[in-house]
C-alpha cells in the first residue's frame, strides 16, 4: 500500500492547522486583535497535535519530516498568500530542499 499521498495530505493539513494556530495569537498580540482569537487558536493547535498523531510511523521521524513540510508551507504559501511577500528563488530552493529531506525521511525503505 502506498502511504505517500495519505502522508502528504496529513502533513499539509497539519501545517495549515499549525500556521493558523500560530497566526491567530500573533494577530491578538501584535495587532491588538480580540482575546476571542485564542479560542480558535486552541482548537487549531489541538487539531495540529491530533493530525500528527495519525501517522503510523515513529513520532520522532514524523516530527522531523513534518518540519520540512512546515517550512515549505510557511514560505511557499503563508509568506506569499497571507503576508503578500513573493518568495525569492532562495526561499523556494530552501523549501524544495526541505521537501526532499522529508521524502527521504518518510519514504526511505526500512526493514520491518
From Swiss-Prot:
Pfam families for the chain: UPF0060
Keyword Cell inner membrane listed: yes
Membrane topology qualifier: Multi-pass membrane protein
A GO-annotated cellular component: plasma membrane
Subcellular location: Cell inner membrane
Transmembrane segments: 8-28, 32-52, 62-82, 92-112
UniProt keywords, alphabetically: Cell inner membrane, Cell membrane, Membrane, Transmembrane, Transmembrane helix
Main subcellular location: membrane
HAMAP family xrefs: UPF0060
PANTHER family on file: UPF0060 MEMBRANE PROTEIN YNFA
Similarity remark: Belongs to the UPF0060 family.
Protein name: UPF0060 membrane protein XOO1791
Native organism taxonomy: Bacteria, Pseudomonadati, Pseudomonadota, Gammaproteobacteria, Lysobacterales
Amino acid at each position: 500500500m502506498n502511504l505517500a499521498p495519505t502522508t502528504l495530505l496529513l502533513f499539509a493539513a497539519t501545517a495549515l492547522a499549525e500556521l493558523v494556530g500560530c497566526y491567530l495569537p500573533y494577530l491578538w498580540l501584535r495587532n491588538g486583535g480580540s482575546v476571542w482569537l485564542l479560542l480558535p487558536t486552541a482548537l487549531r493547535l489541538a487539531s495540529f497535535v491530533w493530525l500528527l498523531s495519525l501517522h503510523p510511523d515513529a513520532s520522532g521521524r514524523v516530527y522531523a519530516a513534518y518540519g520540512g513540510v512546515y517550512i515549505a508551507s510557511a514560505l511557499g504559501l503563508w509568506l506569499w498568500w497571507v503576508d503578500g511577500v513573493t518568495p525569492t528563488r532562495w526561499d523556494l530552493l530552501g523549501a524544495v530542499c526541505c521537501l526532499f529531506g522529508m521524502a527521504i525521511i518518510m519514504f526511505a525503505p526500512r526493514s520491518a
